[in-house]
Amino acid sequence: MEGTKTADVNVGQEKASEKGESIHYIEFDKPYHFEGKEYRGVELEGAWELTTKEKISIDRMYERLKEERPANPILSTLYAVCVATHVTKLPLEFFYKMRASDFLKVETAVRRAFFMPD
């Protein structure tokens, strides 16, 4: 796409990771265009480094957005959106508009961060 900037979404990360360099980098099936930029993936390393205070902040974001409270919010898609938004510093809309197949990769990685730490 002409005139489109490319970002390998290291947004919100202190150090830039090259595509595939980090085990927590999620590569999309095909480039994703959002607000004039092209994204090839997202770095989710921050999900493995969350503090309790950050999780409380994510819980509060989730509470503002949810309509019903599932038995285990961590297993909901919306909670994964909230975590991904927090760790990447990308807006909610970035994840809302993403192809479902790509977001399933993100959602799976977020769940791994909680249930299968490094």
Feature locations, PLM:
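Short, surface-exposed, charged amphipathic helix/loop patches that serve as local interaction elements
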Residues: 2-118
